[in-house]
Amino acid sequence: MNFAKYLEKYKVEWLGILVFTCLCHSSMLLSSSVGIDTEALIADREGLYKGWMLTGRPGLVWLKSLLVVDSFNPYITGVGTIFFVVLSCILWTYLFYRITGQENKCGILAFSCIFSAHTILKEQMYFKLQVMELAVCFCLVAVAVYLSHQFALTKKWYYGVLSLPCSIIAFASYQAFNSLYLFGAIACFFLYYYFHCLKEEENITGKQLWFYILRFSVCFFGAFLINQLMTKLFFSGSGYLNGQVLWGQESVGACLFNIGKHMLKVLLGTQIYYAKTFGVYFLLLVFFCAGLLLHHKEKKGKYLGVIVLILLFLAPFLLTIICGGEPVVRSQLVLPFTLSFMAYALFLFEIKKERYQRILHWSGVVLGVLTTCILLQYTLLLNYTDEIRYQQDEETAFAIMADIDRVQDEEKSYPVVFIGGHPAALNSSCIHGETIGYSLLDWDTKVEPQGYFSTRRIVGFMNALGAGYTWADAETVQTVKAQCGDMTNWPMEGSIQLVDGVIVVKLGDLEE
């Protein structure tokens, strides 16, 4: 069926998924709360865009211009993000349907609910300054992978050419989409091999399968190389991942240990960002794929079936391998997609005995519901945590601003320096994520030169609340920092002083 008929057939399911996605994310996305980095979009938009260009992320700037959302508007951003997340689920599941030819209502629900409820997606939702653009990129990668698949299958060159702009914009927006494209490509070959090649009467040769892989590779590497060349010629290289790469900083053995440790954490689900059912899904996938290979042992190219299964496991850990250890959580966007895909694929397997088929079906349903419920619990707790954090940040910021105004000269505005940090006072029901739960007044306090970058962030946040402060330069920060050792910590008397023409606010003691 074509795309319009696909939408029509599952319109009730998509409406339910839209409501579910709103439940997961609307309380955060549709609020006016400000998180880390978002204050820069409000207080220093041009500086933020320049920073994106300097770190090789021009795609975000292009998309903001294209979507006409270059200023902070949480309501347009929130509605747009929810829409594009649901649209990405529609596009990906339609791609899977076109490859397998199998209608899969339970798979659609499992894929979409697990993906929407995933805590890694929630961590990315926290960054409102870019979240709608990244949701658009999920859609762009789905379209790019679909067009690449059509090129690999039909050999029609224009499909490959059309895939390039979609891939390039996504790759130029966030480096994690390289991994997502690769996993999407491997997922396509997995579906094509296990649910098309093995089941068709036509005996597809190993040579044909290798050419399918080759044409897919041309699409990926073409987009990747164009993006790399464009970045080097017109923008600066990104240091986003460079700071996380441990190869060369630690021994090879230590890096291999770090990689294995992270893989084990994901498989066992030992923290809130890694689902406890990930390993179960993968083992089930291996079991049923092995059964298919044994059942169709007369087919050629069986070794490719084994290879694609190995790649399906390794692809989510591409960033882990590149970094030589666990990358930041928000860059692991491929993991929610991987888990969702495995949940979808489980419903595609068929067993001849009806009784066993029913057991498989209901096992998939139970596992999907269990996974969604576990993820949803943490996602909603992260929503609540951020709400409490922002209330604390806003109240504290207004109190500090009132104290600064009492020191500020009416005729002259002095630059402001913040020393130390002030953590949010969260309650016992809150949970800390990687960034969620941490105060804007207590971020970057350990980054050298200490006091400078944290001051820029705090001043940016206060300016987003309506203040008109300026921050001191790095040299001035170091000078006044040496003179504030005897100052008390805010909110004590004497915690805000005018020192050498600079207002110094001591929030806490600096760590050595």
Language model regions located:
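Signature aromatic-anchored transmembrane alpha helix within multi-pass, membrane-resident enzymes
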Residues: 349-379
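Membrane-interface transmembrane helices that cradle and orient dolichyl/undecaprenyl
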Residues: 141-159, 194-200
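Transmembrane-helix signature of polytopic, membrane-embedded enzymes
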Residues: 96-120, 139, 157-158
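Hydrophobic/aromatic-rich transmembrane helices and adjacent perimembrane loops
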Residues: 319, 324-351
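Alpha-helical transmembrane segments of multi-pass membrane proteins
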Residues: 86, 135-146, 163, 220, ...
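Alpha-helical transmembrane segments
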Residues: 93, 288-293, 345-349
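Intrinsically disordered, polar/acidic, low-complexity terminal segments
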Residues: 2-54, 58-59, 64, 68-108, ...
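Transmembrane catalytic cores of multi-pass membrane glycosyltransferases
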Residues: 24-81, 85, 89, 110-112, ...
